[in-house]
Amino acid sequence: MPGKQSEDRPMEVAAVEDGGDEGLGGLTVEELQQGQEAALALEDMMALSAQTLVRTEVEELYEEVRPLGQGRFGRVLLVTHRQKGTPLALKQLPKHSTSLRSFLYEFCVGLSLGTHPAIVAAYGIGIESANSYSFLTEPVLHGDLITFIKPKVGLPQPAVQRCAAQLASALEHIHSHGLVYRDLKPENVLVCDPACQRVKLTDFGHTRPRGTMLRLTGPPIPYTAPELCAPPPLPEGLPIQPALDAWALGVLIFCLLTGYFPWDQPLVEVDPFFEDFLIWQASGQPQDRPQPWYNLSPAADTLLWGLLDPHPRKRNPVSSIKSYLGQPWKQREEGAEELTKELREDGSRGGQEAAKGEQPAC
């Protein structure tokens, strides 16, 4: 899945007045101050962490067992402590593509948030080697959520609601710290067991304090909120807010329920699926319902309309899903028993396939 590129920079509180206009997402001085406090706390933590880095080669302390994941900027390994035998996950970032500051930032964000049960716990051990920076987290061994999503089908309803509830709680926790996650997608959700009972959010390299100025520099993806696709209200960009995460959560829930992306890009002029959704959202008429939405229940419609409101000030917060848990989110669950059995027996299949043409599949 293509990633989104962006530039971001801190924002001065004085730049937005209390109750700013909708183009600024309605950020108040109080909200921006919360973001600045989060930024200052992270700076202090980074300064301390820089002084306590362990300078050694990873192989001297840990033995590699197997790879757990690979990304554009680094890799994650399952390792064991050479003396104690403790299993750990080690994220390794090469120095040629990662600055010390970027490493310390991601490391410290993970440390500050990792007490939540739906966020991967980070341990306070940062390592500087000759060619890389590394830090340690709890190991989560059943892969990421994209491998569990069956294209054009999704997940069983109970699994969808469990995942959605846990991720919404994790995002609430992040927002309570004055931060915005900014990178919610199945690849950043780790699965703790074959039945997908528990999930954990990981990878905080894109997390930023609320109010940080953001400018999109690459093509949007389905999870990109539409306000980021519009011309920015200020030359520096758009001050980010938790509504960005609410939009991404809505897209993710749709993917889990259907096995489809609702659209490729949230741009009316280039994506007919997004245009169809906005027409239906505006009219509310059954005849305007886009085809991939046919099997969703009225409760799911209301939930997703709230999370996917194109206006950030009107968009419901991630906590809004609590009102819909326990209600049906699908009209019918075709092959539910078989799908649940497949989920338990083979969590590695699914999301690597891609539909060609028509509605984009997960």
UniProtKB/Swiss-Prot annotation:
Task: Write the gene name.
Answer: Sbk2
What GO biological process, any one, is recorded here?
A: MAPK cascade
Say which species the protein is native to: Rattus norvegicus
**Protein name per the record:** Serine/threonine-protein kinase SBK2
Which sites are catalytic? Answer: 183
**Species lineage:** Eukaryota, Metazoa, Chordata, Craniata, Vertebrata
**Chain intervals with Basic and acidic residues compositional bias:** 1-11, 330-348
InterPro entries assigned: Kinase-like_dom_sf, Prot_kinase_dom, Protein_kinase_ATP_BS, Ser/Thr_kinase_AS
Q: Which PANTHER family match?
A: PROTEIN KINASE DOMAIN-CONTAINING PROTEIN, SERINE/THREONINE-PROTEIN KINASE SBK1
Read off the SUPFAM superfamilies from this record: Protein kinase-like (PK-like)
